[in-house]
């Protein structure tokens, strides 16, 4: 019973780290990266659709991305979605592909993106701590109900704390790398 609770908590913490990784990947740096387009949604036959399902992405140069729609009729909508996104870019289309050139980030923009990254990192840590709290409550209830002994409960809480610390450290490490990437000129 306790092992199941600990495993479930660890899985949820792992998911929080994965979400943080995806969020960090979507934050723009000085370089073009296909993951930057993951959260952008375009209108496609009347339905909002993520553009990573409507096109392929390549990065021929460090500050340029090329978006190739699978369906040419979606070209204008994809271009508009990229233009309206918070990437701060002005895409150009030649009728077949969309070229997205990323201007050099100003120091002010870099600082803004670092703040965004820190907020996303904090969200991930709050999520991890929330999972810990729920698992701890579950363990405390098992001890109180007599399903497991107090020693077993303390051991499980120690293991839970170690797991929590491990995943919080992973988020901190991801954040540190993202900050370094953003400050790199």
From Swiss-Prot:
Q: List the disulfide bonds.
A: none
Q: Which Pfam families match?
A: RRF
Superkingdom of the source? Bacteria
Carries keyword Membrane?
no
Where does the record place it?
A: Cytoplasm
The UniProt record lists the keyword Transport: no
What is this protein identified as? Answer: Ribosome-recycling factor
Please state the gene responsible for encoding this protein. frr
């Amino acid at each position: 019973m306790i092992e199941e609770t600990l495993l479930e908590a660890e899985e949820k913490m792992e998911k929080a780290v994965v979400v943080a990784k995806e969020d960090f990947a979507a934050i723009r740096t000085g370089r073009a990266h296909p993951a930057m387009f993951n959260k952008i949604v375009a209108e496609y036959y009347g339905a909002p659709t993520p553009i990573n399902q409507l096109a392929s992405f390549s990065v021929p140069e460090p500050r340029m991305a090329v978006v190739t729609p699978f369906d040419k009729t979606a070209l204008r909508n994809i271009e508009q979605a990229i233009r309206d996104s918070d990437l701060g870019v002005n895409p150009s289309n030649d009728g077949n592909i969309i070229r997205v050139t990323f201007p050099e980030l100003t120091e002010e923009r870099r600082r803004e993106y670092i703040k965004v990254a820190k907020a996303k990192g904090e969200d991930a840590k709050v999520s991890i701590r929330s999972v810990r709290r729920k698992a701890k409550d579950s363990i405390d209830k098992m001890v109180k109900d007599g399903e497991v002994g107090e020693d077993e409960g303390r051991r499980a809480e120690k293991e839970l704390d170690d797991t929590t610390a491990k995943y919080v450290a992973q988020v901190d490490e991801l954040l540190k790398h993202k900050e370094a990437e953003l400050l790199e000129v």
